[in-house]
Amino acid sequence: MVMSDPIADLLTRIRNANVVRHEVVEVPSSNIKKAIANIMLTEGYIRDLEEYRDGSVDMLRISMKYGQNKERIITGLKRISKPGLRVYCRKDETPKVLNGLGVAVVSTSKGIVTDREARKLGVGGEVLCYIW
């Protein structure tokens, strides 16, 4: 099956696993998915990230992170730029999610970075998603 929006698929799988409090979620791997998952790991939204090969398909195993009483660390994931409607921002228009409490993932000429890194680098780009 051909996937029209692999980023939305990644976010939906993580969102669904988060709602039912699964420990691990597995998704097909790609460079952009790895970059988004690495941002989630460095920002503290997931516990661990592992890449493995399942037959002929590269997969990502994402270990979800929860609080002491299984409360969710990720409260929201939202896809912003979609295949049917791309959303871009200039370097001075980089969005803030919940006044800096969340993270906007931006695809720039310097790679896929957070909104804070994009402001620090002085670059704009395509706003992929919000995580809070």
Curated annotation (Swiss-Prot):
Q: Know the name of this protein? A: Small ribosomal subunit protein uS8
- Describe its function: One of the primary rRNA binding proteins, it binds directly to 16S rRNA central domain where it helps coordinate assembly of the platform of the 30S subunit.
User: What PROSITE patterns does the record tag this protein with?
Assistant: RIBOSOMAL_S8 (PS00053)
For this UniProt entry, the molecular function terms from Gene Ontology, in alphabetical order, are:
rRNA binding; structural constituent of ribosome
Stated family = Belongs to the universal ribosomal protein uS8 family.
**Record's HAMAP family?**
Ribosomal_uS8_B
Gene Ontology cellular-component terms listed? ribonucleoprotein complex; ribosome
Q: Which gene encodes it?
A: rpsH
Q: How does it assemble?
A: Part of the 30S ribosomal subunit. Contacts proteins S5 and S12.
Q: In its UniProt record, which GO terms are filed under biological process?
A: translation
Keywords assigned by UniProt, alphabetized: Ribonucleoprotein, Ribosomal protein, RNA-binding, rRNA-binding
